[in-house]
Amino acid sequence: MTTQELRPSAGVRLSVPVERYELKCGAALLVSPRPGAPVTALELHLKGGPSLDPERKEGTAYLTSALLSQGTENWSEEELAAQLEPMGAQIIGSASGLAARVEGKEWKSLAAILSEMILRPTFPADRVKLQKQRLQHRLLIERENPQAQARLGFRRLIYGDHWMGRAAYGSLESVTNINSRTLRAHHKRAWVSN
């Protein structure tokens, strides 16, 4: 085990124990054990995130992550939910990865479920359609929200046409162009390229 020192500001030192594991797929797993902690947090961060969205299909990375829990080769969405609910597990997707939380002793079960979701998602067409509708509804609401528009306008002002100048979950127009095939291709390239 190594100890990594974090220095958020001058004079403050935080020592965090970290165990590093190299996985067969080429990814690195960093573990910071907290013996006796009531909750375990698992996080997966991907290189690239929304920067890998295809042109005119911005929001692909976000939707890919959002749909990982909607069915896998071995489990339907309902079967995944039936496994997660008794554990009190929570999984949240973002354009840059996944975050999950569970009672401390259940972390191995959660890790197995996450592995299935990450390695074998199916992106069912009906679930893709539903998630796109939800995202488009969110985008319509944000279009009328001055705070959301100010944040996006500021990003565009600072970053211009760079990918950081747009919302990580795309636009009404770009989300329309995304389908199951787009998501499978992105997943293959960004999540399991090895």
Protein language model annotation of sequence segments:
Residues 81-193:
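Acidic/histidine-enriched segments that form metal/cofactor-coordinating
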Residues 25-27, 46-50, 179-182:
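Short, well-ordered turn and helix-capping elements at secondary-structure junctions
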Residues 41-106, 144:
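M16/MPP (pitrilysin/insulinase) zinc-metallopeptidase core fold and M16-derived inactive scaffolds
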Residues 33-34, 168:
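Short clusters of small/polar residues that mark proteolytic maturation junctions
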Residues 24-25, 192-194:
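Short, well-ordered loop/turn elements at secondary-structure boundaries
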Residues 35-37, 47, 159-163:
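Short connector loops/turns at beta-strand edges and beta->alpha or beta->beta junctions
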Residues 1-33, 39, 43:
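Proteolytic maturation boundary segments
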